[in-house]
From Swiss-Prot:
UniProt keyword Acetylation, yes or no: yes
Record carries keyword Acetylation: yes
Swiss-Prot/TrEMBL catalytic activity: trans-4-hydroxy-L-proline + a quinone = (3R,5S)-1-pyrroline-3-hydroxy-5-carboxylate + a quinol + H(+); L-proline + a quinone = (S)-1-pyrroline-5-carboxylate + a quinol + H(+)
This protein's encoding gene: PRODH2
Organism listed in the record: Homo sapiens (Human)
Stored Gene3D superfamilies: 3.20.20.220
Name used for this protein in its record: Hydroxyproline dehydrogenase
């Protein structure tokens, strides 16, 4: 867990003399202990090694056979688990979050459970009901992390839709909503009404079993959103595979009809938009305008995106157009355009529009802070920033020190639950891990500074 060396005092707002570019040179690393920095450097270097990411699950099984569960588990807890996971128990999570708060960072809890799109469907509803229980407990934990609890500050947590409904159903809905006339049968308003009433919609494209599963899925989503709203916790819905996006967007829109209305006090259900997809800018603009016309609050988590290798492979297999941007630069340009669109929207609509700039890219973060100052957007959380726990701390700490609202995405749970989740995330975010070279350099420089006081390491 984190060990704080100094308590960080953050500013109340942007610089009074004009915008000043933030420095992401690792200067804020003085807030962390030498042991933390050493572990971070070693783990990030390990995770940047492609064979470890590609064969992570196999290597984990091999280490358990060779070392035994006890030694293997101890090694993981001291390395990867300790770097990226808050802990297993509520007390461990609270301890991690308390340390983050001394660094002016806030928690964004994530339940590490999901269903892979190509996996066999789970039998019955029991698996999804179990996940519902985990989500409700996450709501409780998210709310309990505020000390003392305050209605002035809402907690945030991540929500994975395919933990509550099957990917097979999502694929059926995704193919159906693209057809002419489907908008009447599967409108967000009709789904929202079914969530409230519990009625079976009898959607014509689904068989009886699928319709029953849809009914149960809508009920689960409604129960999570209803409980989260009562506990003052905002839900950030995770992005998933492109093949599921139309269904996920439909379900999020249905939740928004109910929970993002003006009387509810801002967006309680947010959607995630991936800049790596070619259609994201147009879809984001369309959704923002639709929410504004309907009088609904609009919450967005903007990410560069994941799943790139699999998205391209699936498109090639089925002879479809690649839905992803052609290269890193195109993705960066897409992110910049989406960021500008949303910041302008926030400036115009104030508390009815919230944005999380979820990026490890220094230039994207600088663009956001500069435009916030130019547009007069206050540092009250309508625009916040997000990075993964255990990564990009040189950016997170600098933002927190400057007074911006910063969240760290925090998975928690047992080794058995979290390690497979982390390996999948690593496989989906190879570019992020391999692109963390600058952070490794900054960590190395800080460690050299501590080990050899007064000496400067000559860069290679």
């Amino acid at each position: 867990m984190l060990r704080t060396c100094y308590v960080l005092c953050s500013q109340a707002g942007p610089p009074s003399r004009g915008w000043q570019s933030l420095s992401f040179d690792g200067g804020a690393f003085h807030l962390k202990g030498t042991g933390e920095l050493t572990r971070a450097l070693l783990v990030l270097r390990l995770c940047a090694w492609p064979p470890l990411v590609t064969h992570g699950l196999l290597l984990q099984a091999w280490s358990r056979r060779l070392l035994g569960s006890r030694l293997s588990g101890a090694f993981l807890r001291a390395s990867v688990y300790g770097q990226f996971v808050a802990g297993e128990t509520a007390e461990e999570v609270k301890g991690c979050v308390q340390q983050l708060r001394t660094l002016s960072l806030r928690p964004l809890l994530a339940v590490p459970t999901e269903e892979e799109p190509d996996s066999a469907a789970k039998s019955g509803e029991a698996w999804y009901e179990g996940n519902l229980g985990a989500m409700l407990r996450c709501v409780d934990l998210s709310r309990g992390l505020l000390e003392p609890p305050s209605l002035a500050e809402a907690s945030l947590m991540q929500l994975k839709v395919t933990a509550l409904t099957s990917t097979r159903l999502c694929k059926e809905l995704a193919s159906w909503v693209r057809r002419p006339g489907a908008s009447l049968e599967l409108s967000p308003e009709r789904l929202a009404e079914a969530m409230d009433s519990g009625q079976n919609l009898q959607v014509s494209c689904l068989n009886a079993e699928q319709n029953q599963h849809l009914r149960a899925s809508l009920s689960r989503l409604h129960r999570v959103a209803q409980y989260a709203r009562a506990q003052h916790v905002r839900l950030l819905v995770d992005a998933e595979y492109t093949s599921l996006n139309p269904a996920l967007s439909l379900l999020v829109a249905a939740l928004a009809v109910r929970w993002n209305s003006p009387g509810e006090g801002g967006p309680w259900v947010w959607n995630t938009y991936q800049a790596c997809l070619k259609d994201t800018f147009e879809r984001l603009g369309r959704d923002a305008e639709a929410a504004h016309r309907a009088g609904l609050a609009f919450g967005v988590k903007l990410v560069r995106g994941a799943y790139l290798d699999k998205e391209r492979a699936v498109a090639q297999l089925h002879g479809m157009e690649d839905p992803t941007q052609p290269d890193y630069e195109a993705t960066s340009q897409s992110y910049s355009r989406c960021l500008e669109l949303m910041l302008t929207h926030v400036a115009r609509h104030g508390p009815m529009c919230h944005l999380m700039v979820a990026s490890h890219n220094e230039e994207s973060v600088r663009q956001a802070t500069k435009r916030m100052w130019e547009l007069g957007i206050p540092l009250d959380g309508t625009v916040c920033f997000g990075q993964l726990l255990g990564m990009c701390d040189h950016v997170s700490l600098a933002l927190g020190q400057a007074g911006y609202v910063v969240y760290k995405s925090i998975p928690y749970g047992s080794l058995e639950e979290v390690i497979p989740y982390l390996i999948r995330r690593a496989q989906e975010n190879r570019s992020v891990l391999q692109g963390a070279r600058r952070e490794q350099e900054l960590l190395s420089q800080e460690l050299w500074r501590r080990l050899l006081p007064g000496c400067r390491r000559i860069p290679h």
